[in-house]
Regions:
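Short, solvent-exposed coil/turn linker segments
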Residues: 19, 31-34, 83, 142, ...
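Accessory DNA-binding and partner-docking regions appended to nucleic-acid-acting proteins
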Residues: 192-404
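Generic signal for short, ordered secondary-structure residues
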Residues: 24, 95, 125-126, 156, ...
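Intrinsically disordered, low-complexity segments enriched in small/polar residues
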Residues: 12-14, 20, 174, 283, ...
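N-terminal accessory regions of nucleic-acid-interacting proteins
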Residues: 4-51, 55, 401-404
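Compositionally biased amphipathic helical and low-complexity segments enriched in hydrophobic
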Residues: 4-12, 16, 40, 88-91, ...
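Conserved DEDDh/DEDDy metal-dependent 3′-5′ exonuclease domain
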Residues: 29-39, 46-53, 57-194
Length: 404
């Protein structure tokens, strides 16, 4: 009898919750958390020609490595939230994500491309709205700013760094995840119009082509500038070796290496290596070393082995002409700034300020590499071509930049 009396209010509460679930999102939201559902989704999306994409991942924040947690897709009709941790693999998505005929809309997509590549998928047909927006006359430098500028939409980004690996995402996370993709399509339409107006469509296409070949960022341990400044070569070698030890310990625990042993702890071990106190010293550093004897013993053995490293051999000194060397030229910062100011004015005569500003990105570094004799530039060819067109038009001699 009690249960019968409770049914009406429970039913009312359930219907109310369902009706009020995501009123901010004007599209249905579908969860994909099985391999079968992912395969079905891939078949369903086989005929779309425009797909908005975003990802949420953990890059050494809570776990070891680059861990893809959530993929958000929007096909113009519905939002699909793919729980990566619940799936055995993402291979069912390859035909869609790697199909160049399907335009994939992203915003600031370099890391999204990398995290897909880590998972065995190389996206094709990408369209990054961040550079495209600036090359289309919009001034905002963030997605939230662009949404406000173009669509008049306010976007709360506070959930961006929340824990996306939780078994159940909270309501705010779900709304945030959906918002990250549903506005990319109307933004794309506005940006295309701006690109046509300023004749920058080819520039945008080149930016997108460069994005597709971006490589996964290095994650291996590296010395920091303070290590090079404050420690001798032997100590630097010891610090780097201990960083590799720490990396291995982080893999065992599936935790970011700096959670296990901080840079300060490593520096302390190296600075006081003659008085290294072993397991007791490690237990004072981190709770991870107080959890189990086997892990503590392994860490102690590996650290002691690392501290036995001898001095590294002397650096090889090559004869002057043994290796190709960059020319050592000193450029005048004042003259570089004068040149950039003139180039900006030249671009402003052809484009609006936001386009001109974007086209000037990277010019300083390019100039220094060019004047040093480098021939492998990390600088988009279309921007290089525009700059040299200006130099030819103005008759400017780059040798004027060299300090007398």
């Amino acid at each position: 009898m009690y249960l019968l009396l409770m049914l009406p209010p429970l039913l009312f509460w359930y219907l109310y919750q369902m009706s009020m679930r995501y009123p901010e999102i004007p599209y249905p939201i579908h969860w994909i958390d099985t391999n079968e559902a992912l395969l079905e989704l891939s078949n369903q999306l086989a005929f779309v020609r425009l797909l908005a994409i975003d990802t949420e991942f953990d890059r050494f924040r809570r776990k070891y490595g680059i861990n893809l947690e959530l993929i958000q897709l929007f096909d113009g009709e519905a939002v699909y939230l793919i729980r990566v941790g619940a799936l055995s693999n993402l291979l069912s998505l390859k035909p869609i994500i790697e199909n160049p005929a399907v335009i994939k809309l992203l915003y600031s997509g370099s890391e999204d491309i990398q995290v897909f590549k880590v998972n065995g998928i190389a996206p094709k047909g990408v369209y990054d709205l961040q550079p495209a927006s600036q090359l289309s006359g919009f001034s905002a430098m963030s997605l939230a700013g662009l949404l406000q500028e173009v669509l008049g939409v306010s976007f709360d980004k506070s959930k961006q760094t929340s824990d996306w690996s939780k078994p159940q995402l909270d309501r705010e996370q779900i709304v945030y995840a959906a918002n990250d993709v549903i506005y990319l399509v109307p933004l794309y339409n506005q940006i295309k119009e701006g690109a046509a107006r300023f004749c920058t469509t080819d520039f945008i296409n080149e930016e997108n082509a460069l994005l597709e070949v971006v490589e996964v960022s290095e994650t291996k341990p590296r010395l920091k500038q303070r290590h090079r400044e404050n420690f001798n070569r032997h100590e630097q070698a010891l610090i780097l070796e201990l960083m590799h030890v720490r990396d291995g310990l982080g893999q065992i625990l599936n935790k970011p290496p700096h959670f296990v042993l901080s840079d300060g702890h490593i520096e302390d071990i190296v600075s006081r290596r003659d008085n290294y106190a072993g397991t007791e010293q490690l237990k004072a550093y981190s709770a991870f070393f107080r959890r189990g004897y086997d892990f503590l013993s392994k860490a102690d053995r590996d650290i002691r082995a690392a501290l036995t490293m001898p001095w590294p051999p002397p650096k090889t000194v090559h004869a002057r002409n043994d290796l190709p060397r960059l020319q050592k030229v000193v450029l005048s910062n004042e003259k570089i700034e004068d040149l950039l100011q003139s180039y900006t004015l030249y671009l402003n005569e052809q484009y609006v300020e936001s386009v001109a500003t974007y086209l000037c990105n990277g010019i300083r570094r390019y100039l220094r590499e060019l004047m040093a004799g480098a021939d492998d530039f990390n600088f988009p060819p279309y921007r290089r071509k525009l700059f040299h067109q200006y130099l030819n038009t103005s008759g400017f001699d780059l040798n004027q930049l060299v300090e007398a």
